[in-house]
């Protein structure tokens, strides 16, 4: 029998459909028509932006003064060493379980390696540190050479450029960009489900994959908890009558557009392709049409697909339509970054 409702149906079912390694598929149901996507998209964004991970943000190498130095007795120069280091995913054991509301949680680890050896991520395991992708290469140390270095590893979320960590560094340390998010992929599907014979209800199926720093199901629960806390503020205090700021590029949901393309963790081929035409910021990619991106010199299908996937994960698919005001505001913000040399 058809009824006229005065309140939406409350979802009552959450199931783990698949769990393998660092990947999980979760279903939530039932939702009123239109409610599923309303909730699924912000949960996806929070998984990408608010999941807590670990990253090295400070590096000190004995005998090295800046990132453009060479490493004596090591095949890789400092720049390549840093790039390899950023591909390694850490877990700082001492910081696991600590209150995430505490700021500037970090550990310092010291390393010393003597050649000849092929230094890999697994060699960085210690009482303080666990490596979740142990086979990643780091450096090739030649015979009779020694490599001594120290890392400062922070607990954090999202992407933090080196400009923002410089003041945290002790003397002698080089600041590094910190890519903290442990989420490799999160997508969702909306399906129709029957409720008492009515097919006009919906189910969300999340497919979440992490890099191993955090269990994917725990990451999902944490994102839901963050969302609940963010919305809970409206029930706890009166909403102030403040004026809305129309500058799109200053809003929180556009902040990641001013991040450097290094934050996208692109392959070397993709990065070099964009670097050669002067693309430095994510926002510059968002402003490009599909045709413009495909028309970039040496942009093959594989590279295009990789960039498209990364932009989609950020919530800005290739060819995202922005209003004229949004485009103009974003362009001004990017120009401002260029004038400041990348410091926002």
Curated annotation (Swiss-Prot):
Keyword Hydrolase attached: no
Domain notes: The N-terminal domain is essential for RNAP assembly and basal transcription, whereas the C-terminal domain is involved in interaction with transcriptional regulators and with upstream promoter elements.
Pfam families referenced in this protein's UniProt entry, alphabetically: RNA_pol_A_bac, RNA_pol_A_CTD, RNA_pol_L
Single Gene Ontology MF annotation: DNA-directed RNA polymerase activity
UniProt-recorded name of the protein: DNA-directed RNA polymerase subunit alpha
Domain of life of the source: Bacteria
Function according to Swiss-Prot or TrEMBL: DNA-dependent RNA polymerase catalyzes the transcription of DNA into RNA using the four ribonucleoside triphosphates as substrates.
Subunit structure: Homodimer. The RNAP catalytic core consists of 2 alpha, 1 beta, 1 beta' and 1 omega subunit. When a sigma factor is associated with the core the holoenzyme is formed, which can initiate transcription.
Segments for region (Alpha C-terminal domain (alpha-CTD)): 254-344
Similarity comment text for this entry: Belongs to the RNA polymerase alpha chain family.
Cellular component terms (Gene Ontology): cytoplasm; DNA-directed RNA polymerase complex
GO BP term, pick one: DNA-templated transcription
EC number(s) on file: 2.7.7.6
Taxonomic source organism: Helicobacter pylori (strain ATCC 700392 / 26695) (Campylobacter pylori)
Keywords carried by this UniProt record: DNA-directed RNA polymerase, Nucleotidyltransferase, Transcription, Transferase
Region (Alpha N-terminal domain (alpha-NTD)): 1-238
Lineage: Bacteria, Pseudomonadati, Campylobacterota, Epsilonproteobacteria, Campylobacterales
Substrates-to-products reaction catalysed: RNA(n) + a ribonucleoside 5'-triphosphate = RNA(n+1) + diphosphate
């Amino acid at each position: 029998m058809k009824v006229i409702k005065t309140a939406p149906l409350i979802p009552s079912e959450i199931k783990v459909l698949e769990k393998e390694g660092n990947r999980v598929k979760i279903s939530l149901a039932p939702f009123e028509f239109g409610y599923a996507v309303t909730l699924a998209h912000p949960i996806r964004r929070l998984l990408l932006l608010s999941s807590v991970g670990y990253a090295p943000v400070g590096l000190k190498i004995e005998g090295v003064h800046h990132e453009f130095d060479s490493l004596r007795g090591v095949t890789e120069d400092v720049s390549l060493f840093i790039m390899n280091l950023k591909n390694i995913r850490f877990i700082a054991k001492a910081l696991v379980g600590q209150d995430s509301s505490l700021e500037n949680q970090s550990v310092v680890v010291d390393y010393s390696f003597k050649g000849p050896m092929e230094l890999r991520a697994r060699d960085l395991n210690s009482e303080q540190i666990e490596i979740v992708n142990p086979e990643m290469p780091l450096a090739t140390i030649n015979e009779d050479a020694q490599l001594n270095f120290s890392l400062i590893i922070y607990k954090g979320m999202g992407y933090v450029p080196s400009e923002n960590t410089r003041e945290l560094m002790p003397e002698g340390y080089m600041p590094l960009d910190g890519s903290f998010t442990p989420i490799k992929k999160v997508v969702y599907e909306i399906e129709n489900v029957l409720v008492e014979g009515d097919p006009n209800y919906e189910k969300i199926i999340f497919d979440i994959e992490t890099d191993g720093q955090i269990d994917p199901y725990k990451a999902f629960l944490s994102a839901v908890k963050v969302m609940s806390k963010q919305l809970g503020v409206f029930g706890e205090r009166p909403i102030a009558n403040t004026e809305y700021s129309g500058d799109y590029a200053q809003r929180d949901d556009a902040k990641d557009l001013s991040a450097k393309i290094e934050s996208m963790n692109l392959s070397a081929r993709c990065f070099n392709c964009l670097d050669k035409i002067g693309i430095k910021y994510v926002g510059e990619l968002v402003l490009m049409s599909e045709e413009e991106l495909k028309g970039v010199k040496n942009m093959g299908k594989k590279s295009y697909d990789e960039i498209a996937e990364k932009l989609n994960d950020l919530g800005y698919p290739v060819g995202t339509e922005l209003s004229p005001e949004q485009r103009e505001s974003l362009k001004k913000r990017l120009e401002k970054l260029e004038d400041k040399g990348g410091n926002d």
